[in-house]
């Protein structure tokens, strides 16, 4: 009986340690991304990959229904202004706090990525982003714009701390690839 108990405890310890070592995730995509920079190229494989590392203000499910992601709520507060309340307590993969400053930094950067073959300007042009407090932003448009939540599903939010001065190459190398998404980026081996 004692041997059976020792065997059981030993097997349980092996299973627990085996699960702890199984921490590597390999992602397979139909097509390889052209970059890990979430704002470099608005392309299906890039966007699919970025979703694993970064988050948007608004999420969209398989039925194109919106759900809260980094924003917990959004509503038009007048004909030309939307208010987005940001989720509190969110941490970047480096441990720093997510704030409205990251959103403002993101929208400025996403429109100005050098040599982008297909940018995210389509979703940001004609909009003015204003920080109200650390967890509230207003987005203003020239005329009523009911598609604002849809546009905010597309642009991945990046860390202002990690992204300041970062190039597309810094994202590809992992130096600036700090997200809030479900997986933390470790390495990208093009063609692997």
Kindly give the residue locations of the regions a language model identified.
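Surface-exposed binding/hinge segments that line
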Residues: 75, 119-164, 182-189
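Bacterial N-terminal signal peptides that target proteins for export
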Residues: 1-8
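Short, well-ordered beta-strand elements
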Residues: 23-34, 81-83, 103-107, 137-139, ...
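Sec/Tat signal peptide C-region and signal peptidase I cleavage site
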Residues: 16-22
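Extracytoplasmic/secreted proteins, especially bacterial periplasmic and envelope-associated proteins
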Residues: 48, 52, 65, 69, ...
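Aromatic- and charge-enriched surface segment that lines or borders ligand/interaction sites
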Residues: 73-116, 138
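N-terminal lobe/hinge region of extracytoplasmic solute-binding protein
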Residues: 28-78, 108, 176-182
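Cleavable N-terminal signal peptides
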Residues: 9-10, 20
């Amino acid at each position: 009986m004692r041997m059976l108990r020792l065997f059981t405890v030993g097997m349980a310890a092996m299973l627990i340690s085996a699960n702890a070592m199984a921490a590597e995730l390999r992602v397979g995509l139909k097509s390889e991304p052209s970059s890990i920079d979430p704002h470099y190229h608005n392309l299906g494989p890039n966007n699919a990959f970025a979703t694993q590392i970064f988050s948007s203000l608004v999420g969209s499910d398989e039925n194109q229904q919106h759900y809260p992601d980094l924003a917990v709520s959004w509503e038009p507060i007048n004909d030309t202004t939307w208010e987005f309340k940001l989720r509190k307590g969110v941490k970047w993969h480096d441990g720093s706090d997510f704030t409205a400053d990251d959103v403002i930094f993101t929208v400025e950067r996403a429109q100005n990525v050098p040599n982008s073959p297909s940018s995210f300007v389509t979703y940001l042009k004609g909009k003015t982003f204003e920080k109200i407090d650390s967890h509230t932003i207003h987005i203003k448009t020239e005329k009523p714009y009911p598609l604002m939540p849809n546009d905010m599903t597309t642009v991945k939010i990046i860390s202002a701390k990690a992204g300041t001065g970062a190039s597309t190459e810094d994202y590809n190398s992992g130096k600036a690839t700090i997200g809030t998404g479900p997986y933390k980026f470790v390495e990208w081996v093009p063609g692997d």
